[in-house]
Regions:
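Conserved hydrophobic/aromatic pocket- or pore-lining residues that grip, position, or stack substrates
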Residues: 78, 129, 167
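Conserved residues at beta->alpha junctions
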Residues: 82-83, 123, 154
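Short hinge/gating elements
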Residues: 14-18, 51-55, 108-115, 149-165
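Conserved G1/Walker A P-loop phosphate-binding module
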Residues: 2-11, 139-204
């Protein structure tokens, strides 16, 4: 469902030092997270800002530097070690002409790769969907590619409305599945408690 970093996917890593947030070890941790997600770092971009730029987070000058690094390294992905707003993510993707994910998306991706149980995978997908729901405006074409596209749209719906409906449907389905898993677990606990009760025989 998600366009996550593939093994060896070339990426530019961006971490800005904002006022009061300087910690050299955090950049090393960020690189380790990106590597764990399967990204191949082709460039590290850093800089200082007193506060994030409302439009491009890094500012137009730094964003231009990021774009040049992505083009030079043939990177189709830029990962920010910050939480980006939906509008910042959209603006950056339009400016950089490549996919952008923030720290939250990166961590959710790692969780998704490492989830083993059925319930764990559902919980991670639900978190990813909620994260994605605020970013629908950029055009969710990969969902149509995976599910066929034709026949999905309702009468008079715009693509954005279709995407939102499909997203809401999927979230609802996952919640129902998680509810069933929880009920099955509770039934199992009750059965085990019942099995542990001592059996008393009365001889008369």
């Amino acid at each position: 469902l998600f366009e996550r970093p593939q093994g060896g996917e070339r990426a530019v890593l961006v971490r800005l030092i904002l006022e009061g947030s300087e910690d050299p070890q955090e950049f090393a941790e960020f690189q380790e997270l990106a590597s764990a997600a399967g990204a191949e770092c082709v460039a590290l971009i850093s800089g200082r800002r007193s506060a994030p730029d409302p439009r491009l987070f890094a500012g137009s000058g730094k964003a231009a530097e990021i774009r040049e690094a992505a083009q030079a390294g043939a990177a189709a992905l830029v990962i920010f070690d910050h939480a980006l707003s939906p509008s910042q993510e959209r603006n950056l993707e339009a400016f950089l002409q490549c996919r952008v994910i923030d720290r939250t998306g990166l961590i959710l991706d790692i969780f998704a790769q490492r989830a083993r149980s059925f319930e764990g995978k559902l919980q991670v997908e639900l978190a990813q969907l909620r994260h994605l729901s605020t970013r629908l405006v950029r055009g969710w074409t990969h969902l149509e590619r995976q599910r066929g596209g034709i026949g999905l749209r309702g009468p008079g719906e715009t693509q954005l409305e279709t995407d939102r409906r499909l997203l809401a449907d999927r979230i609802r389905q996952i919640r129902l599945r998680l509810d069933r898993v929880e009920k099955q677990r509770e039934q199992g606990r009750r059965a085990r408690r019942k099995a542990d009760l001592p059996t008393v025989s009365v001889v008369g």
